[in-house]
Regions:
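Short, acidic/polar
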Residues: 17-28, 92-101, 199-210
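Catalytic domains of carbohydrate-active enzymes, especially glycoside hydrolases
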Residues: 21-42, 107-108
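Short acidic/polar active-site loop segments enriched in Thr and Asp
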Residues: 34, 72, 110, 218, ...
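Active-site beta-loop-alpha junctions enriched in small/polar residues
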Residues: 9-16, 39-43, 78-81, 117-119, ...
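Glycine-rich, proline-tolerant flexible connector loops at the mouths of alpha/beta enzymes
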Residues: 37-63, 116-122
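Acidic/histidine-rich catalytic cores of soluble enzymes
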Residues: 3-11, 35, 139-251, 296-304
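C-terminal helical cap(s) of enzyme catalytic domains, especially alpha/beta-barrels
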Residues: 283-303
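Active-site acidic/histidine proton-transfer and metal-coordination neighborhood
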Residues: 23-26, 60-61, 65-69, 83-188
């Protein structure tokens, strides 16, 4: 009998207490996580490097630390804007992705993950992200990165989100059809596609995303949210006067993540599932929430 859980829980390294990358990897393992998400900017800050420091020696060092902690990298994050209209900026961003794709292979072949950009050089959250032209720009930039991923045998995973260019399940499907690369996959964060006007339709949006894009989902993000009555900060707003504030999975009870775990049990058991927006005081509870969901959904699926 296959006893793989429905999901394999992980944590974002920068949601753990302050420390070096090595210290945070050990923290993740001590908490019971077996997967981490490692943003390149966190690695750069800890090591005092830029992309030129992504060497075989560093990869060997990190692999030793990861192995000792019983942890592996689910996603190496690279969040440079692929929809920028600034050509010089775009070329530099391409170089960043190439460096991260190469380093991911040195680490053992983990995917490189990214968000879906905005069509302005400031990467500002604005209505221009909703246009067809924005989607064109992102798809063009993504196609270039996918070519590089294919060349090195790597993977690039995009994470759709309301604050970015790929902000609905249908726009995600369109990108997947236009950039038909075997190296392209999706990180699915259900809460990232929500905003105040649609929170009551959250499960319907989730079902549509799984239907349209489920075959390309390679990793999950797990978080919860609350709605607050102001739009004082950019992001998670939609002109209603409210915005979403994100928390770790299970912290507020506003988003029911269990249907996603049930989908995973049937479609891709053991898929990495990274907790987002936890804080040091809540990380252990978020892990317990995911473990309980994974056990319930995995057992239910095995009984079918």
């Amino acid at each position: 009998m296959n006893n793989v859980g429905a999901i394999t829980p992980g944590v974002r390294l920068h949601d753990l207490p302050q420390g070096t990358v090595e210290e945070r990897i050990r923290m993740a393992g001590e908490l019971g996580f077996s997967r981490i998400q490692l943003p390149s900017k966190v690695l750069y800050a800890s090591m005092g490097i830029d992309r030129g420091g992504l060497t075989h020696e560093l990869a060997d060092h990190l692999r030793a630390v990861l192995d000792e902690a019983g942890v592996s990298v689910t996603v190496l994050g690279c969040y440079k804007n692929l929809a920028t209209p600034d050509r010089q900026q775009l070329m530099d961003n391409f170089a960043e992705y190439e460096a991260c794709l190469n380093f991911a292979q040195m680490l053992g072949g983990c995917p490189v993950g990214t968000e879906t950009g905005r069509p302005n050089a400031q990467n500002r959250v604005a209505d221009d992200r909703m246009t067809d032209e924005a989607l064109d720009a992102f798809a063009d930039g993504l196609a270039h990165v996918c070519d590089r991923a294919e060349a090195v045998g790597g993977q690039i995973l995009i994470e759709p989100g309301w604050n970015e260019t790929v902000n609905t399940p249908d726009r995600c499907r369109e990108v997947l059809e236009r950039v038909s690369s075997p190296s392209l996959g999706v990180i699915y964060d259900p809460v990232s596609l929500l905003h105040p006007s649609v929170v009551d339709e959250a499960q319907e949006i989730t079902a549509r995303m799984l239907y349209l894009c489920g075959s390309k989902i390679r990793a999950l993000h797990a978080k919860d949210f609350e709605v607050v009555d102001n739009e004082d900060e950019a992001g998670w707003c939609d002109g209603t006067g409210s915005r979403l504030v994100c928390h770790g999975v299970g912290e507020t009870g506003r988003y029911d993540f269990e249907p996603v775990v049930a989908w995973a049990a049937a479609a891709c058991p053991g898929i990495p599932c990274v907790v987002e927006n936890s804080v040091p005081a809540t990380a252990a509870d978020c892990l317990a929430t995911l473990e309980h969901m994974s056990a319930r959904c995995g057992a239910s699926h095995r009984e079918l």
